[in-house]
Amino acid sequence: MRGIGRYHAPVDGHAALDRAIRKRIDFPKKGILYYDITGVLMNAAVFRYCLDQMVEFYRDEHVTAVAAIESRGFIFAAPFADRMGIPLILVRKAGKLPGDTYSCSYSLEYGKATVEVHKSDVVAGARVLLTDDLIATGGTLNAARTMLRAGGAEVVGFFAVVGLPFLRYHELIGDLPVRTLIEYNQETSN
């Protein structure tokens, strides 16, 4: 039922998206500027703008599955999969999936992390779009791509609402096409 929550029609999708993303200084630790997408989720029109742009970007790309990186990637990938009529593959933190999985560890600025995907969900020859809310260094994306390729899938691109190119994600992910809706080119709240 429309109108129960806060519904604001953005005048300009890009500007409304920027306003909806909350910039939090010193979170989760001192010196980090955190881009909080919960404001996007609180504004139905801005959320719809994100999904509409995603569909527009990939409508003619012959994507046959979308893989979502835990957990905020799920938020954008699930409705995209529904709109496109394609399966949703979950890329989860280690130990969250039962059964046989592909697994890949990668380095973070503060340690290591491991992600997994069900082997049965990765179909050889599938054209997979990887999705997350934000791309920073590209470490999680690269690990997910490694697992999908191990199962014979072709990763055709990566979509994120927010891109942080100053963290040089292109160095790690190389030739993978990246599309973002908004980019921030420095770590400041201005």
From Swiss-Prot:
Its annotated pathway reads: Purine metabolism; AMP biosynthesis via salvage pathway; AMP from adenine: step 1/1
Top-level taxon of the source organism = Bacteria
What InterPro entries does the annotation carry? Answer: Ade_phspho_trans, Adenine_PRTase, PRibTrfase_dom, PRTase-like
Keyword check for Glycosyltransferase, yes or no: yes
EC id: 2.4.2.7
Per the UniProt entry, what are the Gene Ontology biological process annotations, in alphabetical order?
adenine salvage; AMP salvage; purine ribonucleoside salvage
Q: Which CDD domains match?
A: PRTases_typeI
Which species is this record about? Treponema pallidum (strain Nichols)
Nuclease in keyword set: no
Keywords carried by this UniProt record? Cytoplasm, Glycosyltransferase, Purine salvage, Transferase
NCBIfam families in alphabetical order: PRK02304.1-3, PRK02304.1-5
The first-level EC class reads transferase
Give the family, as the similarity comment puts it: Belongs to the purine/pyrimidine phosphoribosyltransferase family.
Entry's HAMAP family?
Aden_phosphoribosyltr
What is the annotated role of this protein in its UniProt record? Catalyzes a salvage reaction resulting in the formation of AMP, that is energically less costly than de novo synthesis.
Q: What positions belong to coiled-coil segments?
A: none
Q: Which GO terms describe its cellular component?
A: cytoplasm
Q: What is this protein called?
A: Adenine phosphoribosyltransferase
Catalysed reaction, written as an equation: AMP + diphosphate = 5-phospho-alpha-D-ribose 1-diphosphate + adenine
- Designated gene of the protein: apt
**Gene Ontology terms for molecular function:** adenine phosphoribosyltransferase activity
Subunit relationships: Homodimer.
* Location(s) in or outside the cell: Cytoplasm
